Curated annotation (Swiss-Prot):
Reaction it catalyzes: N-terminal L-glutamyl-[protein] + L-leucyl-tRNA(Leu) = N-terminal L-leucyl-L-glutamyl-[protein] + tRNA(Leu) + H(+); N-terminal L-aspartyl-[protein] + L-leucyl-tRNA(Leu) = N-terminal L-leucyl-L-aspartyl-[protein] + tRNA(Leu) + H(+)
Domain of life: Bacteria
Functional summary from the UniProt entry: Functions in the N-end rule pathway of protein degradation where it conjugates Leu from its aminoacyl-tRNA to the N-termini of proteins containing an N-terminal aspartate or glutamate.
Protein name per Swiss-Prot or TrEMBL: Aspartate/glutamate leucyltransferase
Main location: cytoplasm
Recorded GO MF terms: arginyl-tRNA--protein transferase activity; leucyl-tRNA--protein transferase activity
Entry's family note: Belongs to the R-transferase family. Bpt subfamily.
Amino acid sequence: MNSNASNTPIAIGISQIFPCSYLDGQQEQLLVIQEETLDPILFDRLLAIGFRRSGSAIYKPRCPRCSACQPIRLPINEFMPSKRQKRTLAHNRDLTWRMTSEHTEAQYALYEKYIRERHFDGPMFPPSKSQYEQFLFCHWLPPTFIEVYDGNRLLAVAVTDTLPNSLSAIYSYFDPDEERRSLGSLLILLQCRLAKLQDKEFLYLGYQIDANRKMSYKRLYRPYQILTPQGWEYSQVC
């Protein structure tokens, strides 16, 4: 693959086949960019062809017998919150939010609580600081943290990459004791708002996996586009 920015070839490797962490009985294989450092412009273009970031690794599913992972993005200028999403915004008007590049102990403490209480049956349990940092941080692209507060108490965090043409939602977590606030939905809505404020064209939400209930919520934000073999296509779901 060549970079349009520099016309320099980019090395791409392929992983071994291993059990899928999202769908029972399926096998997973990844295309992996084998470069120590990437230009943000190039990474934006890689997002547009279905790649994703985990730590400093840039990957894309290339599974032998499955195509369940569908890259999904929101065209920001067309996004319209649903009635339920508007209620979520109204219900949380008492909260404040801010952007920061600072990584804090409070952020990690909230992440640890979230994983222990919400994902104790998943591959990220038990949580550890080293796992957290390897998963979220990238030496060539420091993430932005969108923090949500109730007074001085941190309630939720969205880890977000800022690219020239887009934002990319890396991971979100929140206080499980505040489930009534729909903080996961609020974080996506705040990322949409931030993308609009920064004049970005898209918010990338990662991969939509219809067969995994925990990964199917992304279709609730409309209109959205799914990357197909023919390119990005708008959803036909009403």
